[in-house]
């Protein structure tokens, strides 16, 4: 007989009173002290928008409560699909990816314009219009990681990777990272299909 684990449901963090209240695709890990670290693409207006930031939430009581969002990554692009893995001794790795600005300007422009609430359309379309004034190196998409050596207090510079997976790598028993993902916005990769 299949035994159902005991669960408790509740809300640990909810953003209210802001057009940037959408938070999506969380990942969580736990350190040797039982502290939970969750990351998500936060401060968004909707599923497809130009605003996502990688935010971390820390819980020291098993997920009953958590810190307010701590922004650990905020590029000019939409930082999506944050992943986190704990590697031991205070060391953790966060992953995310960004579509290039060109994808938003071509493939996602109309879906954003047509699906956004009126209060979201202005900021979203304004952000897309600002891309033409930014340096080209800030508008390239890709898959990225940052590493913390001090339980998420500080983070390394951004490291670009050729693959992406929504929740990042896993740690093997010997401490080696294994990262199975899809090639995304590397020099030999194509852009994604247009949303349906």
Language-model segments: residues:
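Asp-box/BNR beta-propeller blade signature and adjacent active/binding-site loops
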Residues: 1-196
């Amino acid at each position: 007989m299949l035994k159902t684990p005991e669960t408790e449901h509740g809300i640990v963090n909810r953003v209210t009173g802001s057009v940037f209240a959408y938070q999506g695709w969380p990942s969580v890990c736990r350190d040797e002290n039982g502290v939970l670290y969750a990351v998500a693409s936060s401060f968004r207006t909707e599923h497809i928008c130009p605003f996502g930031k990688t935010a971390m939430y820390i819980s020291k009581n098993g997920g009953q409560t958590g810190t307010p969002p701590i922004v650990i990554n905020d590029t000019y692009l939409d930082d999506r699909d944050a992943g986190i893995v704990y590697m031991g001794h205070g060391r953790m790795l966060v992953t995310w990816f960004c579509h290039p600005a060109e994808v938003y300007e071509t493939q996602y422009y109309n879906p954003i314009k047509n699906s956004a609430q009126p209060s979201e359309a202005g900021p979203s379309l304004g952000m897309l219009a600002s891309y033409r004034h930014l340096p080209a190196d800030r508008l390239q998409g890709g898959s990225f990681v940052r590493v913390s050596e001090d339980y998420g207090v500080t983070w390394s510079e951004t490291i670009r990777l050729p693959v992406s997976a929504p929740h990042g790598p896993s740690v093997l028993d010997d401490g080696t990272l294994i990262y199975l993902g899809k090639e995304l916005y590397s020099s030999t990769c194509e852009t994604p299909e247009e949303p349906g």
